[in-house]
Amino acid sequence: MINQYKAHDHQKFFPFESMGTCNEISCIGGKCSADKSKIACGISNLGRLDSCIVYSVGGNNQWEFELDILEKTNCEVHTFDCSGPAQRFVKPENDRLHFHHICLGATRSAGPLAEGKPCTREKELCGETWTMTDIQSHFSHKQIDLLKLDIEGWEWTIFDQDYAAAAALGLNLPMQLLMEVHYCVPGRRNPRLECRVQHNYTLETASDVVRFQSHLLKNGYVVVNRDDNPSCPHCTELTLLRVSC
Protein backbone atom coordinates (compact mmCIF):
# COMPACT_ATOMS: atom_id res chain seq x y z
CA MET A 1 0.00 0.00 0.00
CA ILE A 2 2.77 2.43 0.95
CA ASN A 3 4.75 1.65 -2.21
CA GLN A 4 1.97 2.98 -4.43
CA TYR A 5 2.75 6.49 -3.15
CA LYS A 6 6.43 6.22 -4.09
CA ALA A 7 5.79 6.24 -7.84
CA HIS A 8 6.28 9.35 -9.96
CA ASP A 9 2.58 10.01 -10.53
CA HIS A 10 -0.41 11.91 -9.19
CA GLN A 11 -1.26 9.31 -6.52
CA LYS A 12 1.07 11.14 -4.14
CA PHE A 13 -1.50 13.96 -4.04
CA PHE A 14 -4.09 11.71 -2.36
CA PRO A 15 -4.39 14.06 0.69
CA PHE A 16 -5.81 16.73 -1.63
CA GLU A 17 -9.04 14.96 -2.52
CA SER A 18 -11.99 17.39 -2.62
CA MET A 19 -13.55 18.00 0.79
CA GLY A 20 -16.35 20.22 -0.47
CA THR A 21 -18.14 21.32 -3.61
CA CYS A 22 -18.35 24.54 -5.56
CA ASN A 23 -21.57 25.42 -7.37
CA GLU A 24 -19.76 27.56 -9.92
CA ILE A 25 -16.38 26.57 -11.32
CA SER A 26 -14.72 28.92 -13.83
CA CYS A 27 -11.47 28.71 -15.76
CA ILE A 28 -9.63 32.03 -15.56
CA GLY A 29 -6.88 33.09 -17.96
CA GLY A 30 -7.48 30.47 -20.65
CA LYS A 31 -9.18 27.19 -21.44
CA CYS A 32 -9.62 24.71 -18.62
CA SER A 33 -6.45 22.71 -17.86
CA ALA A 34 -4.36 25.05 -20.04
CA ASP A 35 -0.95 25.88 -18.60
CA LYS A 36 -1.76 29.55 -17.97
CA SER A 37 -5.31 29.13 -16.65
CA LYS A 38 -6.56 28.65 -13.10
CA ILE A 39 -9.80 27.15 -11.84
CA ALA A 40 -11.72 29.52 -9.55
CA CYS A 41 -14.88 29.16 -7.50
CA GLY A 42 -17.73 31.68 -7.53
CA ILE A 43 -16.30 34.34 -9.84
CA SER A 44 -19.79 35.70 -10.56
CA ASN A 45 -20.18 36.40 -6.82
CA LEU A 46 -16.88 38.27 -6.89
CA GLY A 47 -18.11 40.13 -9.97
CA ARG A 48 -21.09 41.48 -8.05
CA LEU A 49 -18.88 43.22 -5.49
CA ASP A 50 -18.20 46.93 -5.88
CA SER A 51 -14.58 46.35 -4.89
CA CYS A 52 -12.31 43.40 -4.11
CA ILE A 53 -8.63 42.50 -3.92
CA VAL A 54 -6.86 39.80 -5.94
CA TYR A 55 -3.19 38.86 -5.55
CA SER A 56 -1.33 37.06 -8.35
CA VAL A 57 2.04 35.73 -7.22
CA GLY A 58 4.64 34.56 -9.72
CA GLY A 59 3.18 35.72 -13.03
CA ASN A 60 6.42 35.46 -15.05
CA ASN A 61 5.28 38.34 -17.30
CA GLN A 62 2.20 36.39 -18.40
CA TRP A 63 -0.95 38.46 -17.88
CA GLU A 64 -3.82 36.28 -19.12
CA PHE A 65 -5.09 35.56 -15.60
CA GLU A 66 -4.99 39.19 -14.51
CA LEU A 67 -6.73 40.47 -17.65
CA ASP A 68 -9.52 37.92 -17.29
CA ILE A 69 -10.08 38.87 -13.64
CA LEU A 70 -10.20 42.55 -14.61
CA GLU A 71 -12.79 41.81 -17.28
CA LYS A 72 -15.04 39.68 -15.06
CA THR A 73 -14.83 41.62 -11.79
CA ASN A 74 -14.33 45.08 -10.32
CA CYS A 75 -11.32 43.81 -8.39
CA GLU A 76 -8.03 45.59 -7.91
CA VAL A 77 -5.31 43.15 -9.00
CA HIS A 78 -1.77 43.13 -7.60
CA THR A 79 0.87 41.00 -9.31
CA PHE A 80 4.07 40.09 -7.44
CA ASP A 81 7.18 38.65 -9.07
CA CYS A 82 10.82 39.42 -8.24
CA SER A 83 12.41 36.92 -10.63
CA GLY A 84 14.87 38.54 -13.01
CA PRO A 85 15.28 42.29 -13.55
CA ALA A 86 12.20 44.50 -13.14
CA GLN A 87 12.42 45.86 -16.69
CA ARG A 88 11.57 42.47 -18.18
CA PHE A 89 7.98 42.87 -16.96
CA VAL A 90 5.60 44.77 -19.25
CA LYS A 91 2.36 45.43 -17.39
CA PRO A 92 -0.79 45.90 -19.51
CA GLU A 93 -2.36 49.33 -19.16
CA ASN A 94 -5.18 49.24 -16.63
CA ASP A 95 -5.77 51.47 -13.62
CA ARG A 96 -6.82 48.45 -11.51
CA LEU A 97 -3.70 46.41 -12.31
CA HIS A 98 -0.54 46.94 -10.26
CA PHE A 99 2.85 45.23 -10.57
CA HIS A 100 5.38 44.89 -7.75
CA HIS A 101 8.92 43.57 -8.24
CA ILE A 102 8.57 41.67 -4.96
CA CYS A 103 8.38 37.98 -4.08
CA LEU A 104 6.40 36.44 -1.23
CA GLY A 105 8.03 34.21 1.34
CA ALA A 106 8.17 33.21 4.99
CA THR A 107 10.77 35.85 5.90
CA ARG A 108 11.73 39.26 4.58
CA SER A 109 14.99 39.65 2.63
CA ALA A 110 16.53 42.42 0.55
CA GLY A 111 17.57 40.59 -2.60
CA PRO A 112 20.70 41.21 -4.68
CA LEU A 113 19.48 44.39 -6.41
CA ALA A 114 18.80 46.12 -3.09
CA GLU A 115 22.29 45.09 -2.00
CA GLY A 116 23.84 46.66 -5.11
CA LYS A 117 24.68 43.33 -6.75
CA PRO A 118 24.05 42.50 -10.43
CA CYS A 119 21.06 40.30 -11.19
CA THR A 120 20.05 39.51 -14.76
CA ARG A 121 18.89 35.88 -14.93
CA GLU A 122 15.12 35.44 -15.24
CA LYS A 123 14.98 32.56 -12.74
CA GLU A 124 17.02 34.41 -10.11
CA LEU A 125 15.17 36.19 -7.30
CA CYS A 126 16.47 39.70 -7.97
CA GLY A 127 14.00 41.83 -6.01
CA GLU A 128 13.01 41.90 -2.37
CA THR A 129 11.07 39.13 -0.63
CA TRP A 130 8.27 40.16 1.74
CA THR A 131 5.93 38.13 3.90
CA MET A 132 2.18 38.19 3.31
CA THR A 133 1.84 40.27 6.47
CA ASP A 134 4.39 42.77 5.11
CA ILE A 135 2.44 43.08 1.86
CA GLN A 136 -0.99 43.42 3.41
CA SER A 137 0.24 45.95 5.97
CA HIS A 138 2.06 48.03 3.36
CA PHE A 139 -0.95 48.29 1.06
CA SER A 140 -3.57 48.34 3.87
CA HIS A 141 -5.25 45.22 2.47
CA LYS A 142 -7.02 43.68 5.44
CA GLN A 143 -8.81 41.15 3.24
CA ILE A 144 -7.63 39.35 0.09
CA ASP A 145 -10.53 37.85 -1.81
CA LEU A 146 -8.44 35.59 -4.05
CA LEU A 147 -4.77 34.57 -4.08
CA LYS A 148 -3.27 32.89 -7.13
CA LEU A 149 0.14 31.23 -6.70
CA ASP A 150 2.62 30.15 -9.39
CA ILE A 151 5.78 29.68 -7.33
CA GLU A 152 7.20 26.25 -8.06
CA GLY A 153 8.28 24.61 -4.83
CA TRP A 154 7.70 27.63 -2.58
CA GLU A 155 3.99 27.08 -1.87
CA TRP A 156 4.48 26.14 1.79
CA THR A 157 6.52 29.24 2.67
CA ILE A 158 3.60 31.58 2.02
CA PHE A 159 1.79 30.07 5.01
CA ASP A 160 4.82 29.56 7.25
CA GLN A 161 4.56 32.75 9.27
CA ASP A 162 3.00 34.16 12.42
CA TYR A 163 -0.65 34.63 11.51
CA ALA A 164 -1.57 35.29 15.12
CA ALA A 165 0.48 38.48 14.85
CA ALA A 166 -1.21 39.28 11.53
CA ALA A 167 -4.64 38.78 13.07
CA ALA A 168 -3.69 41.21 15.84
CA LEU A 169 -3.15 43.79 13.09
CA GLY A 170 -6.60 43.09 11.68
CA LEU A 171 -5.24 41.16 8.68
CA ASN A 172 -7.05 38.10 7.37
CA LEU A 173 -5.90 35.12 5.34
CA PRO A 174 -7.05 35.00 1.68
CA MET A 175 -10.57 33.68 1.19
CA GLN A 176 -9.67 31.58 -1.86
CA LEU A 177 -6.42 29.99 -3.06
CA LEU A 178 -5.62 28.93 -6.61
CA MET A 179 -2.29 27.16 -6.81
CA GLU A 180 -0.36 24.47 -8.59
CA VAL A 181 1.36 22.21 -6.08
CA HIS A 182 4.58 20.42 -7.07
CA TYR A 183 6.55 17.68 -5.40
CA CYS A 184 10.25 17.16 -5.97
CA VAL A 185 11.43 14.20 -8.05
CA PRO A 186 15.06 13.62 -6.91
CA GLY A 187 17.82 11.89 -8.82
CA ARG A 188 17.54 13.83 -12.05
CA ARG A 189 20.60 15.17 -13.84
CA ASN A 190 18.95 18.60 -14.11
CA PRO A 191 16.44 18.77 -11.24
CA ARG A 192 13.42 21.02 -11.64
CA LEU A 193 12.94 24.17 -9.61
CA GLU A 194 10.88 22.45 -6.91
CA CYS A 195 13.95 20.31 -6.04
CA ARG A 196 16.25 23.33 -5.78
CA VAL A 197 14.27 25.56 -3.44
CA GLN A 198 16.13 26.55 -0.30
CA HIS A 199 13.78 26.04 2.63
CA ASN A 200 12.90 23.31 5.12
CA TYR A 201 9.62 22.16 3.60
CA THR A 202 10.45 20.69 0.20
CA LEU A 203 7.64 18.39 -0.92
CA GLU A 204 9.15 15.04 -1.88
CA THR A 205 7.45 12.16 -0.10
CA ALA A 206 3.78 11.34 0.44
CA SER A 207 4.31 12.25 4.10
CA ASP A 208 5.45 15.73 3.04
CA VAL A 209 2.26 16.17 1.03
CA VAL A 210 0.18 15.03 4.02
CA ARG A 211 1.92 17.60 6.25
CA PHE A 212 1.28 20.39 3.74
CA GLN A 213 -2.40 19.47 3.44
CA SER A 214 -2.67 19.37 7.23
CA HIS A 215 -0.99 22.78 7.46
CA LEU A 216 -3.52 24.26 5.02
CA LEU A 217 -6.41 22.60 6.83
CA LYS A 218 -5.31 24.07 10.16
CA ASN A 219 -5.49 27.49 8.52
CA GLY A 220 -9.06 26.80 7.43
CA TYR A 221 -8.55 25.76 3.79
CA VAL A 222 -10.40 22.88 2.12
CA VAL A 223 -10.03 21.63 -1.45
CA VAL A 224 -13.10 22.14 -3.65
CA ASN A 225 -11.43 21.22 -6.93
CA ARG A 226 -8.33 19.32 -8.00
CA ASP A 227 -7.07 19.14 -11.57
CA ASP A 228 -4.04 16.89 -12.15
CA ASN A 229 -1.67 18.17 -14.83
CA PRO A 230 -1.52 15.46 -17.54
CA SER A 231 1.83 16.79 -18.77
CA CYS A 232 3.40 16.81 -15.31
CA PRO A 233 2.95 13.73 -13.07
CA HIS A 234 4.27 15.65 -10.03
CA CYS A 235 1.97 18.68 -10.47
CA THR A 236 -1.67 19.28 -9.60
CA GLU A 237 -3.87 22.39 -9.67
CA LEU A 238 -5.85 23.08 -6.50
CA THR A 239 -8.76 25.37 -5.73
CA LEU A 240 -9.15 25.90 -1.98
CA LEU A 241 -11.69 27.90 0.00
CA ARG A 242 -11.22 29.19 3.51
CA VAL A 243 -14.15 27.89 5.52
CA SER A 244 -12.76 28.48 9.03
CA CYS A 245 -12.02 32.12 9.82
Residue ranges and their predicted role:
Residues 1-245:
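Phosphate/nucleotide-binding beta-alpha loop and adjacent structural elements of enzyme active sites
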